[in-house]
Amino acid sequence: MYLKAVESNLVRGNQSLILLPEIALTEEWSRRFFKYFGCRPFIWHSKQSKIQKARIIRSLLSGEPCVLVGARSSVLLPFKNLKLIICDEEHDSSYKQEDGPKYQARDMAIYKAKCSKALCLLISASPSLESLHNSNQRKFHIHHLSNQFHKTQLPSVEIVDMNQSKPSSRTWISKQVFDLSLIHI
């Protein structure tokens, strides 16, 4: 779906960064990229060798058109001509670095895009509360997909007015939710 945005960015001679929440997702994404473009993107994560990392950094600093797919640390890389950042599964808590220097890679991607005058796409089937709030504040724009990627049946959703359905003093969930949870446990 967003491979078209990457393609358009490459045609213009620009660099793209695709952030993924887990290292394990890079291989699947690389295969998808290869199937679409006929070549592999640069891959960045902690398991790459120093030689591989040095080669990638030289390429990024040259400004040559390329696509880098990586885990959260890739947002810290020096791009010379970055014009597109895609943060896939933006809601995922794996984007938060809890040890060492603490940072939220999704938020850094947004800031990096602003500094680079790049487009930043936050992709998620279930956006984070922060992104929904920013959308409500008109800081972000939400684009809804008309077609699902995997054509799965969407779950039914029922909104329970907690003013009408007072929970018991021992719990904070409504009686309807509690009763349904007993059925599905």
Segments predicted by a language model, with ranges:
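Walker A/P-loop NTP-binding motif
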Residues: 2-12
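Conserved Walker A/P-loop ATP-binding site and its immediately adjacent core
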Residues: 15-31
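Conserved helix-turn-beta segment of the N-terminal RecA-like "Helicase ATP-binding" lobe
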Residues: 28-49
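Conserved motor-coupling elements within RecA-like helicase/translocase cores
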Residues: 47-68
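Conserved RecA-like ASCE ATPase "motif II neighborhood" in helicase/translocase motors
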Residues: 70-79
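Walker B catalytic acidic pair
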Residues: 72, 88-90
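Post-DEXD/H (motif II) to motif III coupling segment of the RecA-like Helicase ATP-binding lobe
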Residues: 92-152
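Conserved interdomain linker/interface between the two RecA-like ATPase lobes of SF2 helicase motors
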Residues: 131-132, 139-182
